[in-house]
């Protein structure tokens, strides 16, 4: 009896290892580029394909929507209210707007299946795509079709900083390590154009968010900061700061702004409805009054959603990441 039990256990172990090995081989048996091993990219567009097995699709009664954590979360919950109502009508689903406090938490929430539709900030898009299976498809743009923002390095009047080189020996506020304009782009630019490195040439600090950095400079808590000028524009128009409270000493090329999309395993029919919700949204109500989304985002000259692809529109961001030796591996 003991010998028989031992044989059965040995068989079970061998069979289990065989299944595990087969599972690993199956996971590896598809092209994926830099995507996490859970995903496949058979069409080569750099984003995760929908699962081929329909049983892996998610089709919840309530879709969780998260907007990139910038500025005051309460402001943006109000701003997205009319759009949420529109998306509910188009998808036939309940939509819950969920407030999240950091870029890393947003990526982890999508990776673990807790959010389905999201707007990820510029710098977080590559990690969200590669680690969480995010599929971006649209971006906010002005009515003339222009879109994007610039990274600015700002200081306050009377700081003694008139050009980038003057930051040497002073402190410079970044936002978070995953932010393009708040960390990755300025890091690459400071090194390449000015031969300036954190700790060696200036004291780096992280404020957490763009509005924290902007307010920190305006209040003279930071000598300088790297920020997204679209956030600065909205803060000025909301009278959070005055335009004269800060001075721009560097302005970058234009970068794509927040990318909106869905998680890769969202039921394809639902994913199509989500895309339709963005493309069909009218920024003015039938009576001609502006929607809550327009009221907020016209402050940064945005008034429509335009289709984009991660492969094309985030190429410059991937180049910056490569220069900074950024890894897209899940942590």
What are these regions (language model features)?
Residues 28-67, 71-82, 262, 266-331:
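An extracytoplasmic/periplasmic, membrane-proximal ligand-sensing/linker region
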Residues 29-159:
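Short, glycine-/small- and polar/acidic-enriched structural segments
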Residues 88-99, 193-207, 242-245, 327-330:
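A local structural motif
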Residues 122-132, 186-192, 216-219, 223-243:
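A ligand-binding cleft/hinge motif common to bilobed small-molecule-binding domains
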Residues 135-146, 203, 236-254:
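Short beta-strand->loop
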């Amino acid at each position: 009896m003991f010998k028989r039990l031992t044989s059965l256990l040995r068989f079970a172990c061998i069979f289990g290892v065989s299944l595990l090995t087969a599972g690993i081989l199956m996971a590896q048996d598809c092209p994926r580029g830099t995507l996490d091993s859970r995903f496949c990219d058979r069409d080569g567009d750099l984003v995760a394909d929908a699962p081929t097995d329909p049983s892996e699709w998610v089709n919840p009664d309530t879709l969780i929507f998260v907007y990139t954590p910038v500025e005051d979360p309460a402001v943006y919950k109000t701003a997205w209210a009319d759009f949420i109502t529109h998306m509910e009508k188009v998808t036939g689903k309940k939509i819950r707007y969920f407030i999240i406090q950091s870029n890393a938490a947003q990526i982890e929430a999508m990776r673990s299946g807790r959010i389905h539709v999201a707007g990820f900030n510029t710098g977080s898009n590559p990690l969200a795509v590669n680690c969480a299976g995010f599929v971006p498809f649209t971006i906010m743009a002005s009515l003339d079709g222009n879109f994007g923002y610039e990274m600015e390095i700002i200081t306050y009047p009377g700081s003694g900083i008139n050009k980038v080189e003057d930051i040497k020996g002073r402190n410079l506020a970044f936002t978070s390590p995953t932010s393009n304009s708040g960390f990755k782009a300025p890091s690459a630019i400071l090194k390449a154009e000015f031969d300036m490195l954190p700790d060696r040439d200036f004291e780096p600090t992280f404020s957490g968010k763009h509005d924290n950095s902007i307010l920190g400079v305006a209040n003279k808590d930071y000598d300088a900061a790297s920020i997204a000028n679209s956030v600065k524009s909205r803060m000025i128009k909301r009278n959070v700061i005055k335009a004269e409270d800060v001075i721009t000493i560097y302005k970058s090329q234009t970068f794509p702004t927040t990318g909106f999309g869905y998680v890769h395993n969202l039921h394809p029919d639902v994913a199509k409805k989500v895309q339709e919700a963005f493309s069909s949204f009218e920024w003015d109500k039938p009576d001609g009054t502006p929607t809550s989304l327009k009221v907020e985002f016209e402050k940064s000259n945005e008034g429509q959603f335009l289709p984009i692809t991660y492969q094309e529109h985030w190429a410059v961001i991937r180049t910056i990441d490569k220069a900074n030796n950024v890894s897209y591996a899940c942590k």
